[in-house]
């Protein structure tokens, strides 16, 4: 696999080729995922839950994100590396720039921000200064207490229209990629068709331009609750390398996610 760039992902959308993404937090797994063909590695603030044992992502610091980004960058040769901007690290355009600068210096090639049109000024500020941005709409885990828990978003008409509107606004502000999390299949398909940029889904059905999973979910490393949208690829293969190859294959073929992993 040649080196993946934002231009590569855009061409994949245009050519109707599915994008495979997965979270990574260290050099060893980053190399494994990179070697087996994952296109995108996300250093997710999900590390606050799957590595640190927290109930949400809110306590993750910029320093921790920088550390894990540096680790992943050392292990990956070809995949596009995206780093999450942690909670309350992008409240103003200037703070956003300072956080993004640290993550990019650590090896990220794009930063991800959760939220809607209120981020547009910060997105423009970053893109003007050479920082590619990934948006994130639907279930945004940093807003878990606003939502009242980890719940599917966009099921009523008003909420669906608002997510659609915000997706268009973020695109016009300059994002080059969008993550859609836990939204109904029909809404995800509508947004994917409307946007010029690639849309990566998690719990958003098969119509998006690609899929992302938390690596622990893909390997069945869970502590009780298993989200509907996940699949244990390790259980089917018994080998981590084979598990990631199967994940990449099923995303590429469009067989994952299936109806049992999606919301209506």
UniProtKB/Swiss-Prot annotation:
MF annotations from Gene Ontology: 3-methyl-2-oxobutanoate hydroxymethyltransferase activity; magnesium ion binding
List of catalytic residues: 181
Known catalytic reactions: 3-methyl-2-oxobutanoate + (6R)-5,10-methylene-5,6,7,8-tetrahydrofolate + H2O = 2-dehydropantoate + (6S)-5,6,7,8-tetrahydrofolate
Residues holding Mg(2+): 45, 84, 114
Cofactor: Mg(2+)
Broad class of enzyme this protein falls into: transferase
EC number: 2.1.2.11
Subunit structure: Homodecamer; pentamer of dimers.
Function, as annotated: Catalyzes the reversible reaction in which hydroxymethyl group from 5,10-methylenetetrahydrofolate is transferred onto alpha-ketoisovalerate to form ketopantoate.
Protein name per UniProt: 3-methyl-2-oxobutanoate hydroxymethyltransferase
Gene it is expressed from: panB
């Amino acid at each position: 696999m040649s080196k993946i760039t934002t231009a590569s992902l855009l061409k994949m959308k245009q050519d109707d080729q599915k994008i495979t993404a997965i979270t990574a937090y260290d050099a060893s797994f980053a190399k494994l995922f990179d070697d087996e063909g994952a296109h995108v590695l996300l250093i997710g603030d999900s590390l606050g839950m799957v590595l640190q044992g927290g109930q949400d992502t809110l306590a993750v610091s910029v320093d921790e994100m920088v550390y894990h980004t540096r680790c992943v960058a050392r292990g990956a040769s070809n995949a596009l590396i995206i780093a999450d901007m942690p909670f309350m690290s992008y409240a103003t355009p200037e703070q956003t720039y300072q956080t993004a600068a640290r993550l990019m210096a650590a090896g990220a090639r794009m930063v991800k921000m959760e939220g809607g049109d209120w981020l547009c000024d910060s997105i423009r500020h970053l893109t003007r200064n050479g920082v590619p941005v990934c948006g994130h709409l639907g279930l945004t885990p940093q807003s878990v207490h606003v939502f009242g828990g980890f719940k599917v978003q966009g099921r009523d008409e008003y909420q669906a229209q608002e997510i659609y509107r915000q997706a268009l606004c973020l695109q016009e502000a300059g994002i080059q990629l969008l993550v859609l999390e836990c939204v109904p299949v029909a809404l995800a398909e509508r947004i994917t068709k409307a946007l010029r940029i690639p849309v990566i889904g998690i719990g958003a059905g098969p119509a998006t331009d690609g899929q992302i999973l938390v690596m622990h979910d893909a390997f069945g490393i869970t502590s009780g609750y298993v989200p509907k949208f996940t699949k244990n690829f390790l259980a089917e293969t018994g080998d981590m390398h084979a598990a990631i190859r199967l994940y990449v294959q099923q995303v590429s073929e469009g067989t994952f996610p299936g109806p049992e992993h999606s919301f209506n």
